[in-house]
């Protein structure tokens, strides 16, 4: 089955699962097919998935991940390497910290962090470019199902400042660590700052418990959760450094992954 046939098959099979989508017109253009498939994956509720569908999905997603360019840990310089390159002194835990700008789903590290919502099932908005949607879309339908199985045992929504870990499925990382950061609805408060620190700490703790040696953090809560970027970066770095004071031997590398230029500038100023 070629790529175009795989797209048609997956759209057809996902359409059959939901009566509302059974009569969807399948586009001729492969890019339009791919957009439709992502939308159908995004809105699919958790539930049993046929092995045949998963096999075709995986055959589609894995080449897409490779085509984006998988980034190995060895390709990302540490803070100290960066500082040395520009003639600066070593920084606190600079041999274990990195700043990297780009798509977190490209990173071949032990675990990446997903900024989730309290349902912990991924983003259901078709084609939305939040990190929750991007990670779930690249990992595959298995990720939502894995999250659902954990949430089903919990019988409640996920509290702010905690973390859960799942396999990463079609991503180049081994695991995804999911955390719900605080939502800033009005002004920033000490309680919200503590909640964000708790999210970072919970991710670090669950990473250690699962022998994760290389971990990439996204910018938790700075998107639709409206946490101020500067304050969030300062909390992220301070929390990670404080954790390394007691657990430095547990990690080979912790990466602060940013996507926006403004976040890159903020982290660079704080780290470099």
Regions found by a protein language model. Give the residues of each.
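Macrodomain-like recognition of ADP-ribose-binding/processing modules
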Residues: 1-272
């Amino acid at each position: 089955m070629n790529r175009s046939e795989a797209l048609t098959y997956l759209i057809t099979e996902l359409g059959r699962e939901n009566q509302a989508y059974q009569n969807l017109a399948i586009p001729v253009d492969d890019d339009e097919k791919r957009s439709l498939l992502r939308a159908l994956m995004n809105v699919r509720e958790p539930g049993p998935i046929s092995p045949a569908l998963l096999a075709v999905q995986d055959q589609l997603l894995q080449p897409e991940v490779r085509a984006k360019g998988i980034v190995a840990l060895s390709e990302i310089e540490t803070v100290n390497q960066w500082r040395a390159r520009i003639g600066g002194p070593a920084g606190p835990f600079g041999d274990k910290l990195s700043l990297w700008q780009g798509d977190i789903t490209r990173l071949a590290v032990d675990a990446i962090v997903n900024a989730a919502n309290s349902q912990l099932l991924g983003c259901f908005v078709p084609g939305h470019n939040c990190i929750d949607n991007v990670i779930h879309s690249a990992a595959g339908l298995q990720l939502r199902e894995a999250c659902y199985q954990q949430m089903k045992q919990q019988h409640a929504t996920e509290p702010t400042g905690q973390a859960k870990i799942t396999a990463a499925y079609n991503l180049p990382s081994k695991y995804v660590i999911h955390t719900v950061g605080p939502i800033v609805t009005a002004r920033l408060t000490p309680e919200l700052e503590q909640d964000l620190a708790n999210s970072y700490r919970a991710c670090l703790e669950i990473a250690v418990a699962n022998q994760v040696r290389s971990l990439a953090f996204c910018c938790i809560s700075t998107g639709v959760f409206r946490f101020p970027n500067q304050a969030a970066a300062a909390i992220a770095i301070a929390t990670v450094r404080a954790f390394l004071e007691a657990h430095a031997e547990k990690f080979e590398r912790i990466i602060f992954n940013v996507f926006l230029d403004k976040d890159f500038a903020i982290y660079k100023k704080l780290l470099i």
